[in-house]
Amino acid sequence: MSKQILVLPGDGIGPEIMAEAVKVLQLANEKYQLGFVLGYDELGGAAVDKYGVPLADETLERARRRCHPARRRRRSEMGRHRPGHPPGARPAENPFATGPVRQPAPGVLYPQLAEASTLRPEVVAGLDILIVRELTGGIYFGAPRESRLLANGERMAYDTLPYSESEIRRIAKVGFDMARVRGKKLCSVDKANVLASSQLWRAVVEEVAKDYPDVVLSHMYVDNAAMQLVRAPKQFDVIVTDNMFGDILSDEASMLTGSIGMLPSASLDADNKGMYEPCHGSRRPDIAGKGIANPLATILSVSMMLRYSFGQVEAANAIEQAVSKVLDQGLRTGDIWSEGCRKVGTAEMGDAVVAALATL
């Protein structure tokens, strides 16, 4: 049975970087006889142009229908700031999900890019951390939320940060499961000194920990975690945290890798059905169409897809090795360039990864 993948390039730099990821995926598909069949549709600003909305019902239905039974998706740019986006519309983090979603974002520093990190090489050398972010609850989706005008004419707004025990337990188990197959260390990040939701978070994580005696659990307040990520990031192996904290910390961690252009991510449900994308989302519209965006995070998202959703570890490892080989050759896009390296564009970087993969 063929495995269906829906490719959603989106807008901004999306079509450029997605084209390179598809090149790599197509070679891996042929080389390892993976049996993938690719389909294409629009998302974000490109969907606004075609359908009048950022995510059309027919696109969502196509994802559900075409991708059955595997239902694997890849997307790139959501176009969150696209002019003409319907007022008040908020894009779901994973509108294709069939259940609760978590987002693992691996922060791996390739040794060739130690100089590209803003931290000293000895601080980040050998860095390999994983941030597991709860993706469907918390303050981004909590209710009630309101902006209103007070009687005295002053504007006031508020949001709500709710978490249920089951939501916390589910994401905690994911964090422990991933820590168990890595370095057996899990750091749960919260703000339990002031937030009731974080106090429940910490209590439930402690309960789940009883089922994982082989994993060392620690807790850290989010403000301290943000500081520790730049002071001593190698103390972390797996971090599990809520939606907003994970959103912030994963962006911070991206700079430890040299550039946010190096950081892939996945939005996965309980069955590892997923939507894969670079962490940078729809950023850098200023360079869209110039052919200079870094495609490596998107290419590494392909590797994540093969590993997590399809269990194709050999192919996933090969793509990561191909990226490392290209970096060994001194090829760099502008965001990771340093003296002594050769600056290349989006397509040339993608072609180089394809060539390296072909030799493995």
Swiss-Prot record:
Swiss-Prot/TrEMBL keywords: Amino-acid biosynthesis, Branched-chain amino acid biosynthesis, Cytoplasm, Leucine biosynthesis, Magnesium, Manganese, Metal-binding, NAD, Oxidoreductase
MF terms in GO: 3-isopropylmalate dehydrogenase activity; magnesium ion binding; NAD binding
Biased composition annotated in UniProt, kind: Basic residues: 66-75
Annotated spans, Disordered: 66-101
Record site feature (Important for catalysis), residues: Y140, K191
One GO term (biological process): L-leucine biosynthetic process
Binding positions for Mg(2+) per the UniProt entry: D223, D247, D251
Record's cofactor remark: Binds 1 Mg(2+) or Mn(2+) ion per subunit.
Gene Ontology annotations for the cellular component aspect, listed alphabetically: cytosol
Gene3D superfamilies associated with the record: Isopropylmalate Dehydrogenase (3.40.718.10)
InterPro entries: IsoCit/isopropylmalate_DH_CS (IPR019818), IsoPropMal-DH-like_dom (IPR024084), Isopropylmalate_DH (IPR004429)
Entries under PROSITE patterns matching the protein: IDH_IMDH (PS00470)
Family, per entry: Belongs to the isocitrate and isopropylmalate dehydrogenases family. LeuB type 1 subfamily.
Subunit structure: Homodimer.
PANTHER family, sorted: 3-ISOPROPYLMALATE DEHYDROGENASE (PTHR42979:SF1)
Function statement: Catalyzes the oxidation of 3-carboxy-2-hydroxy-4-methylpentanoate (3-isopropylmalate) to 3-carboxy-4-methyl-2-oxopentanoate. The product decarboxylates to 4-methyl-2 oxopentanoate.
Protein name: 3-isopropylmalate dehydrogenase
Organism, as annotated: Azotobacter vinelandii
